[in-house]
Every structure is written in C-alpha cells, then in structure tokens.
C-alpha cells in the first residue's frame, strides 16, 4: 500500500484516492461507516478524534488495532528517563523500517 503524504490540512478524499481505496475500505479501518465517510468527504465537519485516527491509520500507516497501552508507556518512559536510549532506538527503528 502506498503512503499518502499530506500537509497540515487532511483531505480524506485525496488521501483515499492516493491510497487507491474505496470508501468502505478506507473508512472502516478507523471505525467509520461508508456513509459517514462520504459525508466527511463532502465537507461535513470531521471531529478532531476522527481526523487524528485518519492521520494515524492512513498518513502515518500505523495499524491502530495493534497499539497497546504498555507500548505507549515504554516509549514515554524511555523519552523521559533515558532520552539517549530512546534516540538510539528511534534511529535503529527507522533504519529497520526502511530495510523492510
């Protein structure tokens, strides 16, 4: 699947087209019905939590079903208690992701 790059304003229809997904595929990934997604694409105001889920799932390509509280806690702990280890792991993770 392609990665959609966007500016600060997230236009869901543009992202969906860049990813080559239909409305059902695109919106169901973040728990929105096809008809609800269609309304957002037509200009209805999108709540901030929906916009953030859209960004995480489709722009950042994060599988939000796999995010666990423990994982978030580990990252927060490393960032605050051992920032050098966090930076080193972040660098290694980026290299690993590029090699896949």
Residue ranges and their predicted role:
Residues 46-67:
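DNA major-groove recognition helix of helix-turn-helix/homeodomain DNA-binding modules
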Residues 61-100:
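Short, charged recognition helix plus adjacent turn
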């Amino acid at each position: 699947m392609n990665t959609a790059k966007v500016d600060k304003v997230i236009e869901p229809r543009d992202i969906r087209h860049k990813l080559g997904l239909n409305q059902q595929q695109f919106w169901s990934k973040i728990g929105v019905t096809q008809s609800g997604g269609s309304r957002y694409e037509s200009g209805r105001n999108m709540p901030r939590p929906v916009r953030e889920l859209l960004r995480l799932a489709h722009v950042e390509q994060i599988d939000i079903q796999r995010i666990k509280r423990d994982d978030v806690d580990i990252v927060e702990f490393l960032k605050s208690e051992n920032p050098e280890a966090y930076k080193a792991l972040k660098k290694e993770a980026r290299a690993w992701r590029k090699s896949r």
